[in-house]
């Protein structure tokens, strides 16, 4: 069984016991998060698409950790001007383990 959820402006295809990194959520490590924006659910019976969401469907996940992605380097240079700027950015993410998909 799989589901497609929407969180943080992105869509993720999830299966039970999958580990995924999503945009930062305000949740402590070890807590449970429930997603109600389920866009599609699939299994042996076929695929159910939502319009725009599947009514009554939820996906529950456990927060493993709050983390940051690798550094993305931003380097700007103006030629012949001895002008350069180097900056870095680390995007905060939440690491989740999907514990269950409820099709209801």
UniProtKB/Swiss-Prot annotation:
Organism encoding this protein: Acidiphilium cryptum (strain JF-5)
Annotated coiled-coil segments of the chain: none
GO MF annotations, alphabetized: rRNA binding; structural constituent of ribosome
Summary of the function given for this chain in its UniProt record: This protein binds to 23S rRNA in the presence of protein L20.
Highest taxon of the lineage: Bacteria
Family membership noted in the UniProt record: Belongs to the bacterial ribosomal protein bL21 family.
Record-linked InterPro entries: bL21-like, bL21-like_sf, Ribosomal_bL21
BP GO terms, sorted: translation
Keyword field: Ribonucleoprotein, Ribosomal protein, RNA-binding, rRNA-binding
UniProt-recorded name of the protein: Large ribosomal subunit protein bL21
Quaternary data: Part of the 50S ribosomal subunit. Contacts protein L20.
């Amino acid at each position: 069984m799989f589901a497609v959820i929407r969180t943080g402006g992105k869509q993720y295809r999830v299966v039970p016991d999958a580990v995924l990194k999503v945009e930062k959520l305000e949740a402590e490590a070890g807590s449970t998060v429930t997603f109600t924006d389920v866009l599609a659910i699939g299994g042996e019976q076929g695929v159910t698409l939502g319009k725009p969401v599947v009514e009554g469907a939820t996906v529950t996940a456990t927060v493993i950790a709050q983390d940051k992605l690798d550094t993305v380097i931003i380097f700007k240079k103006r030629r012949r001007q001895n002008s350069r700027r180097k900056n870095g950015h680390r995007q905060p993410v939440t690491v989740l383990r999907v514990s269950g998909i409820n099709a209801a």
